[in-house]
Amino acid sequence: MAVFIGGTGTDVGKTFFSSLILGKYGESLGLKYFKPVQTGDDSDRITLMRLTGLHESYVLKNYYSLAFAGSPHYSSELEGTEIDTDELSRHLYSIRDEKIIIEGAGGLLVPLNRRMLTLEVIRQAEIPLILVAPTSLGAINQTLLSIEAIQNRNIDLKGIYFLGIPDKTTEDNIRTITEWSGVISLGSFFLNSNERISCECFQEECIPKFDLDESIKNILV
C-alpha cells in the first residue's frame, strides 16, 4: 500500500527519511518514490537517488514542478496556474494500493491552492500517514499541533518517526510527545550535523542502523 510521508514543517527530514526507506527496502519490496508537488529545483528526487544509488525507475516524476521555492499555492500563482487538488486527490486515491512512498511538500497544513490544504488531499485520497518530527527544542509544540490536525481529519496515522540532531531536550521531547498524543514512535535517527552526507556514508552507516525492529517494514508489507 502507499504511505504518505508528512512532516511537522519544512526541512524536518522527510526526504532523508524517504531515502532511508527506499535505500533499505526499495529493491526488496519493490517500492517507488513519489513527490507529487515540488517547488524550487528538483533536489529531493536527485538527493534520494544520490543517497540510495537507486535507478531513476524507482523515482516517479513530480505531478507538479514549480520553479519558485515557496508554498505550493503561491509558487503556482507566480506561474499563472493553480494546482488542481481534485485531480491530485483522485490520482493519489487511484495509487493508494500500490507500493509507493509519497512525500509531501513542506508541512501538513501547507496550502496547495487557496482552498485546499495538504492534509485535506491526504484525507480525500485515504492514504495512511507517517509523521516525521524533529527532536530538538520546540519539537513538542510542533508535533502535537500536527497530530491534532491529523486526528481531527480522521487520517490513519501509523506513527511518528523522530529525526534530527539531538540536544539535551531530545529524550524528554520524544517521551512527552508520545505520552501526550498516544501515538506510537516508529523509531528515531540521530544525525551529528547538518552537513551533506555522502552516498557511501549513507549506504554503509545509515541504512544498516535504520528500522532494526522492522516497524516501518511491517507497515509497508
Curated annotation (Swiss-Prot):
Q: Which family does it belong to?
A: Belongs to the dethiobiotin synthetase family.
Q: Which organism is it from?
A: Leptospira interrogans serogroup Icterohaemorrhagiae serovar Lai (strain 56601)
Q: Which reaction does it catalyse?
A: (7R,8S)-7,8-diammoniononanoate + CO2 + ATP = (4R,5S)-dethiobiotin + ADP + phosphate + 3 H(+)
- What protein is this chain from? ATP-dependent dethiobiotin synthetase BioD
The main location is cytoplasm
Q: Which cofactor does it need?
A: Mg(2+)
- Asked whether the UniProt record includes Magnesium among its keywords, one would answer yes
Q: Where in the cell is it found?
A: Cytoplasm
Instruction: Tell me the superkingdom of the source.
Output: Bacteria
